[in-house]
Amino acid sequence: MNTKILETLEFSKIKELFAPYLLTEQGQLELGLLLPTSKKETVVSAFLEMTDMQQIFVQHPHFSLAATQDITALTKRLELESDLNIEEFLALKRVLAVTQELKSFYEDLENVHLEKLDRLFDNLAVFPKLQGSLQAVNDGGFIESFASESLSRIRRKIQENENQVREILQEILKNKGEMLADQVVASRNGRNVLPVKNTYRNRISGVVHDISASGNTVYIEPRAVVNLNEEIASSRADERYEIQRILQELSDLFRPHAAEIANNAWIIGHLDLVRAKVRFMQETGAVVPDLSEEQDIQLLSVRHPLIENAVANDLHFGLDLTEIVITGPNTGGKTIMLKTLGLAQIMAQSGLPILADKGSRVGIFSQIFADIGDEQSIEQSLSTFSSHMTNIVSILEQVDSESLVLLDELGAGTDPQEGAALAIAILEDLRLRQIKTMATTHYPELKAYGIETDWVENASMEFDTDSLRPTYRFMQGVPGRSNAFEIAQRLGLSEVIVGHAQEQTDTDSDVNRIIERLEEQTLESRKRLDNIREVEQENLKFNRALKKLYNEFNREKETELNKARLEAQEIVDLALSESESILKNLHDKSSLKPHEIIEAKAQLKKLAPETVDLSKNKVLKQAKKNRAPKVGDDILVTSYGQRGTLVKQLKDGRWEAQVGLIKMTLEEQEFNLLKAEKEQQPKRKQVNVVKRANTAGPKARLDLRGKRYEEAMEELDAFIDQALLNNMAQVDIIHGIGTGVIREGVTKYLRRNKHVKSFGYAPQNAGGSGATIVIFK
């Protein structure tokens, strides 16, 4: 694609519209290099990627990426055997963390079929060992002491020496404070010094490092700490050497994987760009257009992307048309319509969504040429006409049948009669070569050309003669007219003068009357089309509302069914409990054999129905109505499915219940009574039966990887509550390493929870700092 069309249509400004939605430097770089292409398979691939990302957003509306830096230069440095510094390793650390998050997200992705993006997700390479090694590089920009034994030993020595220096200096401050200009320890040339009054400089022996501007204060390093400071300086040098050795070791570890990590970064940036395109679509109403097999263009409600509140227009440039000629006066929006077509094509061929409605269709052109605006060259001393004609000559030499040509004010800048003749000749040459062309002109002669010539259609921009303002609405099939007589009369010119002017142009008046009738017919057709679209929109709204009601009905139905199942299970549990009590009594008071007891128990279990319709059980309904809860009753909390005991009734009618390790305040409708009062139970014979052991324990692990922060905190809160209700002693929380946001949120939550006895990271072989083990009180 020639670069001149990109400058003419301000394609760089189009790309700037997508920049705010990008999160990664790699995505910004890819956007900056984005250019239109004539390769259909490339455009199709970009369109499918956007469709895939739209599906992801349906299931995960808040899908996002963490910010990453461009690592192209540093991966090349690795390949060239150079060593990386701490900041560069932090950039690698972030890329590996985002890679892990994306991989986990993709593995957990459900109900989404991806046609193109699946290949990108699959190609992400995860390096757990490399990520583990980078734990030694702290996000604050320093190497952790545990990176090596030598570094840990050196830093301990520095700490010890610094403590000794601090103690000695504090002692001097305490004992010789009157000799000091200030009761603080200062620093000069990297050494700890004391601000000594000049009159006492000989009373404190040591090394003078500085003197104040006034000369009243001398900064002295006491001799008692000189040797210690020398040791600290030496240890600092050892520390720097050891850090450099660690960085070299890490560089050697990463070097074999530089290409794969660079590819990860590219995939992250590309996914970021695709995500930005879809976010742009969500914010602006842009769409992914259909792609025509031939040069068949249909743009529905298309808008100019760089004009705020631009008027939407329909444009049909199908296979039955080679040229569209937009006629009419200036300032009506002809040039904007010309640019809108060009931008829609360039954006689509760059793999970007276009500002139009669904059902829009674009073609694929090998080149797009344009002569738009006044490109007069002062240096070449060319007139407006010469400038345009030079450009048009160049276009005619380069175009072929796969090109799209946009010509603004064709033939302008010279004698009107000659200019019109040239314009018709140029258009005819392009038509015979079957080159798609849209041209604007104010010459009336081209109206007749549009009417009389095959494969050519007239068009114009609507003008409101009442307000004397253009409406910027595109009227395809209707040639433009000047409206000069109507405008002059409305502005106050006498009817006599206007009438005399009309007599001078009888033929033109007839043509204008025909055009006026065509305009009226077009407006009527447009009104009908608008009405049809309004009905379609109402139908869509109705269908969406109906679908919403249907889904709500199904959810409520499922909720009621679940509630009924819980109540039914309560009855079943009660029956089984009573049956075990009966069998226990029988076992104590009879000589039944064990296998006979088991058979009897199995038969009793069969008495429990698979489902119980409580709504039709009048006896149970009456029994529940007659019996009120009281302190000491066993209950089932319906929202949690957990058993508890009523402790006391509050003044407002609510109940306080002990459920596991926590106390809860419940409304009466939030729990069900489990057992009848003992005095209401009939006396039964006792049989001893061995109870079944429940081997299915509650879930003791929570995986928060790939979750949003708010979603993760909600799941964590519910999980801890459930663990406490089940009297669990210990649970594991997997949060991953990533950006550290979720890990920090988990830590803050656990610190605030009064039921947590202790918590800490898992052993290295069980997840390390990517998992937290929680022990309850």
From Swiss-Prot:
Uppermost EC category: hydrolase
Segments traversing the membrane: none
Protein residues bound to ATP: 328-335
UniProt cross-references to Pfam families, sorted A to Z: MSSS, MutS_V, Smr
Keywords assigned by UniProt, alphabetized: ATP-binding, DNA-binding, Endonuclease, Hydrolase, Nuclease, Nucleotide-binding, RNA-binding, rRNA-binding
A biological process term (GO) from this entry: mismatch repair
Subunit details: Homodimer. Binds to stalled ribosomes, contacting rRNA.
Family: Belongs to the DNA mismatch repair MutS family. MutS2 subfamily.
Protein's name according to its UniProt entry: Endonuclease MutS2
Organism: Streptococcus sanguinis (strain SK36)
